[in-house]
Amino acid sequence: MDFVHCNKCFNRKPPDGFFISSCFHIFCTKCAKADLAVCLICKKNVRLVRLDGNISSGIKIYFADPIKMVADSLAKIQKKIDFQQSTRDHLVKYLTKEKEKKRQMEVYFRTKGQEFDSQRKKLAEATAWIQMAEKKLQASEEERVKAEREIEECQAKLKSMTNLMSADTLGMNSQTPFPFSLAESQETAPSLVESSANSTFNMVSPLVSSPASSPNSINYNSFFENGSRTRPESLNEEAMFNTMLQSSGQSANANTSESSAFSVAFNNIFTPSRNNMGDSSMINKTTANQTIMDKTSMSLENWRQNRANSFGVHDISKRDSSLPTGGGSAIRVHHFKQNSRITPIAQNRRSAAGFDRQQIQEMRRISSQPGYLAQRKPINGRSFIGPAD
């Protein structure tokens, strides 16, 4: 420390060392006295301290090397700067992370907000759909109740119709009335319907006497072979009977019993089955019977036209006088007016009634012969039925 000297005598190396006052003036031992109370330089009250190794660090720092002190200070300052920088960097790093988290949270909440809006729209649509479905369910329930009520009504109607049809079926099985109006005849024909509990109906023709005559009573083969020699062309009964039998599913060879062909045909037409017939079988049977009667009407019409061409038109006005009535006849007589609406069969029967008694009896006798329908005989040079199967 070459700069230390006595500020009064300027002695640089005193033997007893130096003193430093509280006003930072240095004095040697010679100049400074132990009882020095006033500074010799600035004249202030001072307190003296010996400069030796026991001085305090506060005083010692003034005698240290300034470069070293600066270096130490710089090092300390650098440490302070480093500490502060590291602390600052740590804070900045934390704030940066928080900022990134904030940005991510903003993106997240923005996305969730969009999803929330979408879910809210879907919820509104689902609510509307539920309301519509509830309305449809209520309407469907009403329709179901209505349909059940209609089904119950239909079942009740069906039950009543079934009971009615069952009653009609029982009535038909018990007795089937003859639907044709009967012409007046001299002789009382047998009963039109003869039935019993264990047999089918036996329909008898009103124009044919039953039982039939013996096959040997008349040569009916020669009658058809040379019919014009004995009498005018008669009724085309063969075509009519075979048409009725073929329509009802019967063969011409079936007429081998004692009953006449006309009786067999009427029996097949109007005899219902003793079994319990269903609605479908009844309808089919009615349709078949109607077809048979239509074909029978056509056969009678052909006979009437043939007879009109051969002998002239029959005078219908003489119907009541052409046949004897017979006072004891139990058959009801139906008088037909010329302008009244009648069925084709009734018209044909009225035309057929124009024959005299002898001709009608002859027709009855011929048509009741066994095997009459099995033979194919031409009448007036024409054949009205096909060959027998």
Swiss-Prot record:
InterPro entries: Zip3/RNF212-like, Znf_RING, Znf_RING_CS. Residues 123-164 form a coiled coil. GO terms for molecular function: SUMO transferase activity; zinc ion binding. Its main location: nucleus. It is found in: Chromosome. Residues 366-389 are annotated as: Disordered. Expressed througout the gonad (at protein level). Expressed in the germline. Interacts with zhp-4; the interaction is required for their localization along paired chromosomes and stability, and for the formation of chiasma during meiotic recombination. This is Zip homologous protein 3.
